[in-house]
Amino acid sequence: MNKLMSAAAVAAAAAAGAVLLGTPAAQAAGYPDKPVTMIVPFVPGGSSDITARSVTPGLSKILGQTFVVENKPGANSAIGAQALARSTPDGYTMMVGSIGTFAINEALYKNLSYNPSKDFEYLTQAVRNPNVLVAAPTFPASTVAELVDYAKKNPGKVSYASSGTGSSDHLSAVLFRQRTQSTGVDVPYRGGGAAIADLIGGQVNVSFQNLGAVQTHIKAGKLKALAITGDARAADLPDVPTLAEAGIKDMVVYSWQGFAVPKGTPAAIVQQLSKALQTALRDPQTEKTLQGLGFEVVANTPQQFAAFQQAEVKRWKDVIQKANIQLE
């Protein structure tokens, strides 16, 4: 009898400890027991959509439930983000968003329908990829130094194409001009494809474009690569220097994608989803596929991603305020 009581006492103590520690076993028992909706706040085929569809098979295998991708595009990802913010915080609605969704929009919009810093629990920063400073083949500058020199000798004449006002490529150009104390003209397009097409055609001079979107054009000689915005050279473009190597300090910039759930989601579910996402992202075949598309897998913890998100908000808020950019 005493032995039975001792065993029961040990089990009770272990269970109590699990509750106090907030472990998934104690807090998320039975989760998930129905399909999970994964919001993508952009149209199909973009970086966030690719990231979502790359991990859903792994998540389903790990957690034993279907993960349904639901595209909710519009308002520079605000429609999908607002839908997540207003959803029940039970772990059955999550979202993959971008640097714009989770950081830039907070600094850019005067009246944003959601608050990236208050409305979400962050799960993991999934992937990141640098931008490449590219120039039209006919543009006279072929290095960063030549571009800066040309811009200073021809103030306000260099045209910077971007995928839209407030995009990471637009703000990379703004930050570049701040760092180099040079000037230029922003030419926003409705998406990166149109910007790249006009850049190749020589209608605009330079642009900071996503590595995956321009590397084939660079290798084909249709665009000139001046520098990469990452903290190291890209394996696929080993001859292209980083901006730091080109003499531009404090300008490491990555576009990135990450996962979040609504604020108030139980901590155990947050941890369970985060660990499952990290495992799915680190699957060798998934990682190889993402790398082939120009992504670097990050797969960090909720705490690391939340801290990074706050640092990114502050950084881009400083850049945007200095440039006096604001959208309604």
What name fits each language-model region?
Residues R128, V214-D283, A311-K314:
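C-terminal lobe and pocket-closing loops
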